[in-house]
Amino acid sequence: MELIFLGTSAGVPTRTRNVTAILLNLQHPTQSGLWLFDCGEGTQHQLLHTAFNPGKLDKIFISHLHGDHLFGLPGLLCSRSMSGIIQPLTIYGPHGIREFVETALRISGSWTDYPLEIVEIGAGEIFDDGLRKVTAYPMEHPLECYGYRIEEHDKPGALNAQALKAAGVPPGPLFQELKAGKTIMLDDGRQINGADYLAAPVPGKALAIFGDTGPCDAALELAKGVDVMVHEATLDMAMEAKANSRGHSSTRQAAALAREAGVGKLIITHVSSRYDDKGCQHLLRECRSIFPATELANDFAVFSI
């Protein structure tokens, strides 16, 4: 998997940062796998500066209904339709997302020529497609808001083909059954258990993408042990009280959570427009003083998971 940040500014865009939107490229060889987390104004313009086509999008996750996370959605939906894209799209978001989308399309005389499903969510598991599952956790914010935990299922270990051939198992369809952990019977009556010829499973990756939030009860469970945690760092340590009063977090709080949760990497985003490049480096230094494995997201930055 890889993350592509399309927008990293909080509240309003700046000359170098658009408002919030994050692409998750699942990099699955046989299935569509491009997900979008939040869709601030101008997201479709940001997409034009990447190698990704909106037609590859099959899921959009909205954290909450504040405009800097949402106002780019109607335009993206319409442009996707005007481009002749017919691939189905599912939108997940809090209560009100259906009314917002349907109203925007209706009063603008717009529609989609592709199947569009809108799912209003609550806390808990959203779906499990057999390859990965997504779970929503409630955030601490003035509006109903969610963070998302994406967990890949463990992958089967490699099949020891050499040992199977030595045991007299012919390559072909039987190998596929054994790869699935099944037991087969050979023509000579011997039973071969696939589990005996599989290496240990390959652990799946886990990712936590937080919505806007101050310190909250669900944060540790959402982030626990993930490979990558994406968290806002709207303001610096000195302005922590102001950040919390508006349902946001400081650099210290994001980094302390990453340390407590035992994450592999922290990526901070949703930076207040008050910070220029020098100020953003100050935010990064504050985080790294607590959790060294911290990166600062810039627009179009790409991170492998």
UniProtKB/Swiss-Prot annotation:
Active-site positions on this chain: 68
Single GO molecular function: 3'-tRNA processing endoribonuclease activity
EC code(s) of this entry: 3.1.-.-
Cofactor: Zn(2+)
Cofactor note as given: Binds 2 Zn(2+) ions.
One of the Pfam families matching this protein, by short name: Lactamase_B_2
InterPro entries: Metallo-B-lactamas (IPR001279), RibonucZ/Hydroxyglut_hydro (IPR036866), Rnase_BN (IPR013469), RNase_Z/BN (IPR013471)
Function: Zinc phosphodiesterase, which has both exoribonuclease and endoribonuclease activities.
PANTHER family associated with the record: ZINC PHOSPHODIESTERASE ELAC PROTEIN 1
UniProt protein name: Ribonuclease BN
Protein species of origin: Escherichia coli O81 (strain ED1a)
Gene: rbn
